[in-house]
Amino acid sequence: MPKGDIVLIKFPFTDLSGNKLRPAVILAVTEMDLTVCFITTQLQWLEATDVQLMLNSLNGLKKPSLIRTSKIATLDKSLATGLLGKLSTNELEDLNNNLSSG
C-alpha cells in the first residue's frame, strides 16, 4: 500500500468514544502501522488545507469528498479492511502541497 492509496479503515473519533469505518488516504506505511488522513463527504467542512476529491475511476469513492489534512492518525494495519482506489497524480501533488503548507 503506497502513499496515495485509498483504503477503508476503522477510524477513531477524536474523543475516542468509538470508531467509524471510513475511507482514508495513506500517507506512510511501516511494518505494523499506517499513517492516514481521513476522507469525508461533508463538503461544508472544507478547510484551507483540505483536498477536494471528485468522483473518478481511479479513487473508488461514491461521492465527492474532502481529504481532511487536519485529521491524521497512525493506526495498526489490521484496521484497514480494503483498498478502494488511489489518488491521481494531481490529487497526490495537492495533498503533498497542503500537508507542507498546513
Per-segment meaning from a language model:
Residues P12-L16:
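Short, charged beta-turn/beta-strand-edge "cap" motif at the junction between a beta-strand
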Residues S17-K20, I26-S57:
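Compact nucleic-acid interaction/catalytic patches
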Residues P23-A24, R68:
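Short hydrophobic/aromatic-rich motifs at helix boundaries and adjacent loops
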Residues L58-G102:
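C-terminal terminal-subdomain/extension
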